[in-house]
Amino acid sequence: DAGKLIQVRTHTRFVHFPKHTHNYIEVIYMCSGSTRHVIDGNDVALMQGELLFLNQTAVQEIYPAGEDDIAVNFIILPEFFDYSLKMIGEENNLLRDFVVDCLRGENDSSGYMHFKVADVLPVQNLLENLIWSIWNRQPNKRSINQATMGLLFLQLMNHMDRMEMGTGGKQR
């Protein structure tokens, strides 16, 4: 899988993951059930249909997930977001700032963004499309995945009132 800008993996259940960081951006989508995380000292409960973005500097601890707790982890290299960033334009907002900070390797924003969007059908559909597209090899896969992520960002920008972020980084 070396060289891939985005990968998808199922979340490992029944195991405690002590505090750690990643050299990539992690996006966790909770398909069913829930998982409990401590991110940069903040307790985060990720519920079914919710989305959690973690930057490269986020310190994450994960408590064991149960049998019915199913999550998908997107492992994303920062350059994957180049196209998506063009789609969301130049307007300043917390999501754009988060992505730009990830691209620059800076930690000016919080280490995570938690979107409580379980009842937002377009977001759920785009996440399902992204998982399907990554899992199933097809022509134009990279462009499709990057455009889908851009559409996901645009939808999330319409629901910033459902986003929570950690206390780290600068506040706007």
Task: Indicate residue ranges for each PLM-predicted region.
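Short, Lys/Arg-enriched, Trp-marked, Pro/Gly-tolerant hinge/linker segments that flank
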Residues: 112-117, 134-147, 154-172
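Histidine-centered metal-chelating micro-motifs
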Residues: 34-36, 52, 56-61, 80-82
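Short acidic-glycine-tyrosine-enriched beta hairpin
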Residues: 41-56, 64-66, 70
